[in-house]
Amino acid sequence: MKNIISSPVEVPLLLPKHNTNPATRPQTSQTTRILLLLLIAISSSLIWLRPTKPYPSTSNSSAFKHPHERNPSYLVSGKNGVVASEEARCSTIGIDVLKDSGTATDAAIATALCVGVVNSFSSGIGGGGFMVIKPPTGCSTKPCSSRTPISINFRETVPDGDYYQAEFYKDPSKSRTGGLSIGIPGELAGFQAAYQRFGGGVSWQRIFQPSIDLAKNFSVGPALAVVLSDPRIHPWMKTKTEWQSVFQPNHRIAQLGDWIQRPNYARTLQIIADHGIHPFYHGSIAQQLVDTINRHGGRVSLADFQTYQPIIEQAINTTYHNYNIWTTGPPSSGAILLHAMNILERYSLHDHPRTPLAEHRFVESLKYAFSARTELGDPKFMNSSELARMDLIESKPYGLKTSLKIDDDRTYDYSHYKPKYSIVEDHGTTHLSVVDRFGSAVSLTSTVNLYFGSNVMDPINGVILNDENDDFSIKGRSNAFDLYSSPLNYPITGKRPVSSMAPIIVDYLHPQPSNGSLVEPEFFCALGASGGSRIFSAIIGTLLKLLWGYDLSHAIEDPRLHHQLLPNEVYVETSYRSDFLDSLKSKGHNITMIDIFYGKAAIHGIHKRLSEDTLFGSSDSRKHGVPDAY
């Protein structure tokens, strides 16, 4: 049974279920409207009366909401399963799959497909990403006989050809829009690989059906409405027939609550539900995509689709005291996240109250982590010395050595941290987390990169294609700090670009008893984020707050700070604690205040208190997320 924990003055304004029809929706009475307005007014007044000190540890189900003016996040709880995503309808679709005996992997795929329908600006089967899967308890079959988490890298790849570097150097805009910006999509291949290993509680068709139905007719949700209101997308969206037919249902760009249809995309999902991914990589859909990409200036062949393969391997990990953190390897930023946690381990931050000094150390760890990120690349294209360097960066001794360089009294200019190359800033993405009653967990991040990817939609199958080639470095280009682009991230046939994505699953390692019996690690949390280069700073900050005793909703909603070394600025969200801010300024940090909705990272996660059975889920209000549980 799902419990929604909220303060008594807050009224959940949930979107309708995915099968709601506008003709049958109940009408709100005038009396109800008045009551809602009164409750909102009372809530607004109480917000200003709430303290802004750190949230205390919550030991029961009565939790405060974060005192922000935006809609608060929901904290849901259940003992059988939780799905946390950026869209209420998609979280519910995932829970419905779990209720039908689906696994966490089944539910994660169903949820991700749904997000690709209703929030197609950030993800979809025309994109790719990374996931970490923790196998279920008691599984004896080969893929999960060990409970060691695995990672699936379904990042997009560069099509065959040696002209991308020269084309992007001559005209960098070609890496952002049009056919040359498109990498070979990996999402469906990644989903099939996950389903074959850890899915099957429900059929492949059952996983796809809710999104097929949804694509035929759905209302514009808050996240999509925000993106569609951005005037930067209007010029091209209003001039392309295939986009007009979907996003201009009333001869204007759709707005919140408008009903839109994606019938071509629904048919494509139906084909994949009936026949698997073969049509997408080897058949008619693949040929349609090849033709569309090339018509928009690309140079791909059917062979580029036919040869695409996801990469399945053991997840990489580090320990932070008694917590085992599992994530995805390069070219994701999982290794960089682990490096930051290794830097911070010496301070045992979780054993002490949150202080201004702890915030300074956190910022410094980010600056060193982003310096290390400039040496990231696709391992398949790295030589032995480059691979050894990446192994060193992930290691405990290197993290400790780096932590000893942190000065508790001051910060430094970027050159002190010795970045080797310039930093490529990526964008977009969606994240979701799922835990089921079998003890399996999935942390999945997917993207089409910039809003609506390459701005190319196939007119026949409705697939919106990524612009992932924009995440590569351009040879010969230097940035404003005279740092040149990284040769480790140049576009080469088959290569996957560097990404900020870093989904994590964290277990607690119980002390082993003296009698020699083994105590299995206990699930602690699954976290991940959307938001480009702000992703892993948001994940680390949220994880630290969970370790400080915050409940999940508070850990996610608390104002954040972010530093990516270049530019040498600490980006601080409004409502951040003023005493912490003053301390950072006193140590020489350059502060830039940002609106909570500008350049945001959105965290969607699941948490379990140690030695308890209840799972808690929360989705970030920065992207209007709503979780579900039962």
Spell out what each predicted region is.
Residues 1-28:
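Short, low-complexity, Lys/Arg-enriched N-terminal segments of secretory-pathway carbohydrate enzymes
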Residues 312, 426-429, 451, 499-501:
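Short, small/polar residue-rich loop motifs at catalytic or cofactor-binding pockets
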Residues 97-98, 189-197, 275-282, 287, ...:
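Alpha-helical support elements that line or immediately flank enzyme active sites
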Residues 61, 251, 349-448, 461, ...:
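Internal maturation/activation junctions in enzymes
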Residues 48-51, 55-96, 104-275, 280-282, ...:
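Noncatalytic scaffold domains of N-terminal-nucleophile
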Residues 30-54:
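Terminal signal-anchor or tail-anchor transmembrane helices
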Residues 117-140, 148-151, 299-301, 440-517, ...:
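Active-site rim segments in enzyme catalytic domains, especially the processed small/beta chain
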